[in-house]
Every structure is written in structure tokens, then in C-alpha cells.
Amino acid sequence: MHTSAHSGGLLASILNRAGPLKALNALNGDRVETGKIYVAPPNRHMLVEDSRFRVIGGPRENRHRPAIDPTFRSAAIAYGKRVIGVVLTGALDDGTSGSMVIRASGGTIIIQDPNTALFPSMPENALRMVPEALVATVPKFPSSLPNW
């Protein structure tokens, strides 16, 4: 979710009300832990290196910071085929190049059915470039996840 630099990190609190997994803004140096949802803090990209988060300013991508493409690319490098990238509703093409990198490294991409997206261009663009991605409505995402 692209947020304002002054949003105060609302996404984590929204996600905490939506389900059982704990969501939090990643802090620079935090270890990646299973069972948690990590969100890029406002105005920062979130990268993964050596099982830790790197939270940086960096240039805007797809006119946004944070953007998901830097996260997807770094996760693909760090975890290869163990990465699951999820592209949800949104504008422009953020998530597309990162999805391509995840697939090239053997990872899995799940894309929200564009017909159910409030803003379909992100899922449409990702699906155009990664046609073998799994497509599902948001309620069906859990059953789309590979069993590891």
C-alpha cells in the first residue's frame, strides 16, 4: 500500500484489526520472523538482507517510497524459491518487475484477481508479465499458498 510520508504507519494497525497475524512496521536491523506481517514504514523502502530488514530512503520507484519492487527483489535474492510475493489492488505497475525477479528465482507469485481489485492496474500489469502467477480473490489467498 502506497502511503504518505506523513501517514504515521497506519497500515500495520489496519492489518492488526483484519486478522490473527501481528503486523508491524519493520525497523532497520529487525530479524525476519515467521508468523508476522512486516510493513515498510512511511517514506522508506524495506529490503531484506541476511534475514534482517534494511529500511532505507533511496530513490522513489514507480513514483513511490515505499514501493514493493525493492522488497520483492531483495527477498528473491535472499530467499530464492522460498519467497511468496503477493500483488494486491493498486495503481501503476509497482510489483511487476519484482514479481518477475521472484519468478525467475523460483519463487511463487499470487496476484489478486484484477476483476475484484478496487484499483486493478497493479494486478493487471503483474499478471501480464508473470502469466503463470496464481490468481485468486483475496478471501482465497490462504488456500493458494504452497504447503511447506
PLM regions: where:
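Conserved acid/base catalytic micro-environments in cytosolic active-site loops
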Residues: 1-148
